[in-house]
């Protein structure tokens, strides 16, 4: 059975006019290596830590600024939100289609809340805590092309023509702000688009981005702003001692107009200085060590890297299944071809390398989890290929071959073909990222040993379900298994209303 909303009734939960207070027993285990009767043994010790959570239930008016607003993702997301807000329907060859938010974790997925008369009860994911309604989001942003959003939507060739015709009046007067352009960081073939750029030194560019964000917030009377990079993949930045390895060196490098500071890092610096969350939706190393230091010092949320939408999401599920089933993946070969501007930009070797790194590391934690299958240092052969084929446009093809060792030296091969409508998969992920980043800024917590409430760590690990290469704080394990990532996010929000993690034991029926 599905219910639209619910309220938790528990001595551990208190609802006030503006807040939800919850007391939560976090049950975990720690492993120690101890001398027991003269021999060292691994000892697993269960422990319980009591946490207090405090969630501000006042939902703000949210502004979202996209870097690369006029690209396929930005124009598709903007069009989709307008279509939902206006209740637009359109004719396809199959039926009359209604606007929806399918593909969004927050808007179109559900969570189990319990049972009623022997029937499982489910509720919308978004009903856990008060979230911003995507229909109410105000969009803005930057692009190195001055094409209006209606023409950008047409150029992208993602949405049906009937829908585009209905959306044009809403979008034809929307023009992105000038963006930061540095041809050294993206493919040369992007130069023809760059007619809408911010001039000046890197310090002047950062100052302009700050000015843009302040004016956007004031003009639209929004309470909060979240910025997300959905522009071209950049090449990797070189991390150099004295340049970008510390907060001080990074800021001094901006002042000196050092060439190795990328545009995405400049946007992120501007956001951190303004106290605005910044999310990187591309695979490059935007978050150099100095930028992470800056975010931690200023306690500003940063998240990334790279939207996890198609092939990589499937890979993080399938490899988790194989390793969890005691099957040993020995070879993973992933081939992609796509024809949109992302594919065109990735045709340059330096930008492809950023994507290759992002896609290749997705199985590492799952392999490391099973010392029965894999010796120390052993790893499956893993190859990623991406080719630009203009004809297929935004309809990316992903073909994967998984070869594994099974019982008694046998071999198993799984071949998968996945047609990924690139921007239609990415757009709802962008929506989830900004909505979850916003709600994260309204949650505070403390352990029983801490005196006062504090926010989550600025490096937003809980967004990892939505990213290929999750950004984590120093010393934190990287988790790529999709089921674990979703469970982490759901269980944190469940804790905010005093609900236990979903353990799927259903002992009441045993």
Swiss-Prot record:
For this entry, the protein name equals: Inositol-3-phosphate synthase
Pfam families hit by this protein: Inos-1-P_synth (PF01658), NAD_binding_5 (PF07994)
- Which prosthetic group or cofactor does it need? NAD(+)
Q: GO CC annotations? A: cytosol; nucleus
Catalytic function, reaction form: D-glucose 6-phosphate = 1D-myo-inositol 3-phosphate
Q: What does this protein do?
A: Key enzyme in myo-inositol biosynthesis pathway that catalyzes the conversion of glucose 6-phosphate to 1-myo-inositol 1-phosphate in a NAD-dependent manner.
Instruction: List GO BP terms, alphabetically.
Output: inositol biosynthetic process; phospholipid biosynthetic process
The EC number on file is 5.5.1.4
What Gene3D superfamilies does this protein's entry cite? Answer: NAD(P)-binding Rossmann-like Domain (3.40.50.720)
Task: Enumerate the subcellular locations listed in this protein's record, separating them with semicolons.
Answer: Cytoplasm, Cytosol; Nucleus
**Which family does the record assign?**
Belongs to the myo-inositol 1-phosphate synthase family.
Q: What class of enzyme is it?
A: isomerase
Coarsely, its chief localization is cytoplasm
Q: Show the InterPro entries listed in the entry.
A: Myo-inos-1-P_Synthase (IPR002587), Myo-inos-1-P_Synthase_GAPDH (IPR013021), NAD(P)-bd_dom_sf (IPR036291)
| Taxonomic source organism | Brassica napus (Rape)
Residues holding NAD(+): 70-73, 143, 180, 190, 193, 230-233, 281-282, 306, 309, 340-342, 355, 393-394, 422-423
> Pathway of this protein?
Polyol metabolism; myo-inositol biosynthesis; myo-inositol from D-glucose 6-phosphate: step 1/2
């Amino acid at each position: 059975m599905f219910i639209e909303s619910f309220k938790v009734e528990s001595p551990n939960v208190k609802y006030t006019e503006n807040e939800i207070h919850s007391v939560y027993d976090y049950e975990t285990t720690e492993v120690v290596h101890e001398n027991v009767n003269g021999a060292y043994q691994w000892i697993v010790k269960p422990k319980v830590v009591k946490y207090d959570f405090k969630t501000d239930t006042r939902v703000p008016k949210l502004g979202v600024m996209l870097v690369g607003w006029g690209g396929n993702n930005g124009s598709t997301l903007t069009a989709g939100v307008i279509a939902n807000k206006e209740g637009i329907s359109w004719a396809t060859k199959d039926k009359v289609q209604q606007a929806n938010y399918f593909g969004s974790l927050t808007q179109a997925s559900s969570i189990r809340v319990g049972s009623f008369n022997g029937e499982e009860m489910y509720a919308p994911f978004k009903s856990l805590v008060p979230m911003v309604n995507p229909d109410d989001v105000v969009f803005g942003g930057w692009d190195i092309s001055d094409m209006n959003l209606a023409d950008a939507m047409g150029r992208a060739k993602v949405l049906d023509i009937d829908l585009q015709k209905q959306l044009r009046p809403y979008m034809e007067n929307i023009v992105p702000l000038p963006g930061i352009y540095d041809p050294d960081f993206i493919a040369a073939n992007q130069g023809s688009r760059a007619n809408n750029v911010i001039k000046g030194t890197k310090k002047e560019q950062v100052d302009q981005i700050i000015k843009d964000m302040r004016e956007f917030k004031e003009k639209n009377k929004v309470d909060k702003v979240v910025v997300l990079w959905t522009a071209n993949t950049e090449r990797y930045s070189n991390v150099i001692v004295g340049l970008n390895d510390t907060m001080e060196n990074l800021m001094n490098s901006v002042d000196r107009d050092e060439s190795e500071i990328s545009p995405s890092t400049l946007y992120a610096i501007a956001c951190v200085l303004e106290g605005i969350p910044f999310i990187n939706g591309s695979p490059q190393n935007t978050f150099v060590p100095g930028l992470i230091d800056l975010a931690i010092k200023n306690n500003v949320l940063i998240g990334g890297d790279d939207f996890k939408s198609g092939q990589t999401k499937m890979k993080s599920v399938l490899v988790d299944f194989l390793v969890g089933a005691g099957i040993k993946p020995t070879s993973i070969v992933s081939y992609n071809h796509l024809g949109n501007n992302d594919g065109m930009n990735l045709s340059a070797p330096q930008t492809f390398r950023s994507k290759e790194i992002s896609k290749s590391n997705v199985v590492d934690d799952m392999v490391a989890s099973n010392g029965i299958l894999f010796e120390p240092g052993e790893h499956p052969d893993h190859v990623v290929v991406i080719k630009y084929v203009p004809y297929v446009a935004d309809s990316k093809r992903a073909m994967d071959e998984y070869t594994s060792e099974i019982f008694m030296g046998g071999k198993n091969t799984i071949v998968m073909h996945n047609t990924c409508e690139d921007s239609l998969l990415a757009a709802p992920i962008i929506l989830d990222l900004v909505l979850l980043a916003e709600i994260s800024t309204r949650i505070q917590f403390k352990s029983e040993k801490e005196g006062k409430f504090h926010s989550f760590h600025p490096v937003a690990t809980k967004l990892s379900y939505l990213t290929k290469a999750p950004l984590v704080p120093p010393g934190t394990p990287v988790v790529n298994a999709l089921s674990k990532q979703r469970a982490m996010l759901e269980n944190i929000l469940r804790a905010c209303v005093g609900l236990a993690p979903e353990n799927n034991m259903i002992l009441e029926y045993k």
